[in-house]
């Protein structure tokens, strides 16, 4: 049986305070994300030919899946992927400015880090309804985009490096309707070491 797992966080639920409150984080990870994982496993249970597929393989090839499970995999697989990356790129010791190779590439494509912050913040804040704001590697270029619902940049052939979740369950208990305030404060949690590592891995994968 296909058995995707809810990832363990590298920090406790209260360690992203005050930017993300422990109540929100515990529900977001332990309830919302867990539901996506459980639903994805249930969807794939009877499709043994898919049990050896990675999450990325499933999401990059939705058009090859049996039609009756495409929507469920898109939503639940996407939910699992988006949340897993969201947790990875945050840290109690986050914030500050980018470092390593990704810092140089950000300066090249956005001129300054502040320009990236402005563009990604606007993409996240202006996303109508639920979705995500992303920094992605598109070929050799960095760009900003947003996606609705649980859609991922993988479906457009782009490699995600950084993501912010702007579904209401990501912030509503603390920020209510103040999405811009949540987005501003989220920058204090960004784990730039992890983003740089994602960038290096993405560049390496394109060479194979």
Swiss-Prot record:
One annotated GO molecular function: metal ion binding
Q: Which residues of this UniProt protein bind Mn(2+)?
A: 28, 83, 165, 169
Q: Which GO terms describe its biological process?
A: removal of superoxide radicals
The record describes how the cofactor is bound as: Binds 1 Mn(2+) ion per subunit.
Q: What catalytic activity does the UniProt entry give for this protein? A: 2 superoxide + 2 H(+) = H2O2 + O2
| Gene3D superfamilies found in the cross-reference section | Fe,Mn superoxide dismutase (SOD) domain, Iron/manganese superoxide dismutase, C-terminal domain
Query: Which Pfam family would be a valid example here?
Result: Sod_Fe_N
For this record, an example GO cellular component is: cytoplasm
Name the UniProt key words of this record, in alphabetical order: Manganese, Metal-binding, Oxidoreductase
Which cofactors does it use? Mn(2+)
Superkingdom, taxonomy of origin: Bacteria
Extract the InterPro entries matched here: Mn/Fe_SOD (IPR001189), Mn/Fe_SOD_BS (IPR019833), Mn/Fe_SOD_C (IPR019832), Mn/Fe_SOD_N (IPR019831), Mn/Fe_SOD_N_sf (IPR036324), SOD_C_sf (IPR036314)
E.C. designation(s): 1.15.1.1
* Stated family: Belongs to the iron/manganese superoxide dismutase family.
Q: How does it assemble?
A: Homodimer.
State its role. Answer: Destroys superoxide anion radicals which are normally produced within the cells and which are toxic to biological systems.
Q: What is this protein called?
A: Superoxide dismutase [Mn] 2
Q: Which organism is it from?
A: Bacillus cereus (strain ATCC 14579 / DSM 31 / CCUG 7414 / JCM 2152 / NBRC 15305 / NCIMB 9373 / NCTC 2599 / NRRL B-3711)
Tell me the name of the encoding gene. sodA2
């Amino acid at each position: 049986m296909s058995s995707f797992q809810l990832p363990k966080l590298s920090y406790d639920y209260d360690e992203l305070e005050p930017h993300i409150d422990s109540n929100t984080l515990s529900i977001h990870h332990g309830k919302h994300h867990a539901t996506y994982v459980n639903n994805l496993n249930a969807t794939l249970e009877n499709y043994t030919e898919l049990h050896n597929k990675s999450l990325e393989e499933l999401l990059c090839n939705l058009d090859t899946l049996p039609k009756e499970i495409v929507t469920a995999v898109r939503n639940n697989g996407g939910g699992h992927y988006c949340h897993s990356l969201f947790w990875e790129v945050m840290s109690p010791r986050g914030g500050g400015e980018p470092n390593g190779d990704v810092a140089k590439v950000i300066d090249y494509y956005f001129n300054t880090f502040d320009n990236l912050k402005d563009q990604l913040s606007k993409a996240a804040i202006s996303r109508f309804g639920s979705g995500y704001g992303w920094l992605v590697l598109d070929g050799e270029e960095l760009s900003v985009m947003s996606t609705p619902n649980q859609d991922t940049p993988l479906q457009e052939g782009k490699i995600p490096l950084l993501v912010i979740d702007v579904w209401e369950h990501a912030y509503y208990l603390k920020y209510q309707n103040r999405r811009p305030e949540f987005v501003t404060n989220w920058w204090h949690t960004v784990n730039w070491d992890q983003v740089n590592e994602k960038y290096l891995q993405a560049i390496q994968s394109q060479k194979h």
